[in-house]
């Protein structure tokens, strides 16, 4: 029988299992752990056994000297590789304040204070000498010794102009803007002012007479007496154009030809239309007679005169060729097509 065909008991009582398997009882009993030792003979201690706990309980804390405590603190406290202690700024608040105060590399404290304005409500007990020394300390200066201007104080001129008078009225306010210095200059004030009012022809005549009578308008009278161009006259073209191009650069432009020079003109030959006289080959192709080719710039030649063949004459026969077909006119050809 095979192993998978062996009968397996299904119903078994719990008591029968204990009696049948004595090895299970031995497994249920706790076994004593065998002591494991190192090759040197020392016991192996992993720190998780009962023996280690007993040893820890047996060890009582001993009161050591101050030097031992310091050594323990040194061992627990962090230290840099060179032996110095790192400063985390968490010891005391007073120490932190001292350390957080800004200082220059030479140890001096920087002065971030601005101009000290004069205190109108200063105490009477403070002497004038002490106030002067304070102002000197707070005043800033450039390396050249000059005082910087931050434009954070009102100017004396503007403050004096804005102060109200005894009657409670403020003084004139001067407006400053870009170009105000030129607009207030006498050269700008003496410029003629334009008038946009519509004037009648009588007023225009009066103004013209006043200008002519005044000595200052002598230049204007001279300009008026000078001849003026008539409105209907055609203006002459400009002698020199605005854009000067080199000759020959503009296509279609007439080149600069001296006066009295005319290029030679050749007589162009007249091309005579071949007409409707033609010859018919034995193969049935029609041959037209064309005039010879003429160059347009060639010298004048005698025009080509076409000599049509007579109707009754026969074309010259070629030696050794088949006889040609009958010569017909264009009218006969059209008549045959209509039929």
UniProtKB/Swiss-Prot annotation:
Statement: the UniProt record of this protein carries the keyword Transmembrane: no
Region (Disordered): 1-240, 309-339
Cellular localisation: Cytoplasm
UniProt feature, compositional bias: Polar residues: 13-25, 196-212
Principal cellular location given in the protein's record: cytoplasm
Record's GO cellular component terms: cytoplasm
Keyword RNA-binding in record: yes
Keyword set, alphabetical order: Cytoplasm, mRNA processing, Nonsense-mediated mRNA decay, RNA-binding
Pfam family, one: PNRC
Cysteine pairings via disulfide bonds: none
Biased composition (Low complexity): 111-131, 213-237
Extent of Basic and acidic residues compositional bias: 26-38, 91-100, 163-173
Family named by the database record: Belongs to the EDC family.
Record's function text: mRNA-binding protein which stimulates mRNA decapping.
Protein name: Enhancer of mRNA-decapping protein 1
Gene coding for it: EDC1
């Amino acid at each position: 029988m095979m192993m998978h065909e062996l009968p397996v008991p299904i119903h078994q009582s719990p008591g029968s299992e204990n009696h049948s398997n004595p090895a299970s009882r031995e497994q249920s009993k706790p076994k004593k752990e065998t002591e494991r030792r190192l090759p040197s003979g020392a016991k192996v201690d992993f720190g998780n056994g009962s023996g280690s706990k007993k040893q820890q309980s047996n060890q009582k804390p001993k009161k050591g000297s101050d030097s031992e405590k310091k050594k323990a603190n040194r061992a627990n406290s962090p230290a840099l590789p060179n032996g110095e202690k790192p400063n985390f700024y968490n010891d005391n608040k007073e120490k932190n304040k001292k350390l957080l105060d800004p200082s220059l590399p030479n140890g001096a404290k920087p002065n971030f204070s601005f101009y000290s304005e004069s205190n109108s409500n200063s105490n009477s007990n403070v002497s004038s000498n002490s106030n002067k020394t304070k102002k000197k300390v707070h005043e800033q200066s450039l390396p050249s010794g000059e005082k910087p201007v931050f434009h954070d104080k009102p100017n004396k001129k503007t403050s004096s102009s804005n102060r109200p008078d005894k009657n409670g009225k403020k003084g004139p306010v001067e407006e400053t803007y870009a170009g105000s210095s030129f607009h207030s200059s006498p050269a700008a004030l003496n410029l003629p002012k334009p008038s946009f009012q519509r004037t009648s022809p009588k007023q225009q005549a009066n103004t013209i007479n006043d200008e002519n009578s005044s000595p200052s308008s002598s230049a204007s009278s001279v300009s008026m007496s000078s001849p003026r161009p008539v409105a209907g006259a055609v203006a002459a073209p400009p002698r020199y154009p605005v854009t000067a191009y080199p000759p020959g650069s503009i296509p279609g432009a007439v080149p600069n030809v001296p006066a009295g020079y005319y290029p030679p003109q050749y007589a162009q030959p007249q091309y005579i239309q071949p007409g409707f006289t033609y010859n018919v080959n034995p193969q049935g192709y029609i041959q037209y007679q064309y005039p010879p080719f003429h160059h347009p710039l060639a010298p004048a030649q005698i025009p080509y005169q076409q000599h049509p063949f007579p109707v009754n004459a026969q074309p010259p026969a070629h030696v050794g060729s088949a006889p040609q077909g009958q010569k017909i006119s264009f009218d006969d050809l059209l008549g045959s097509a209509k039929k």
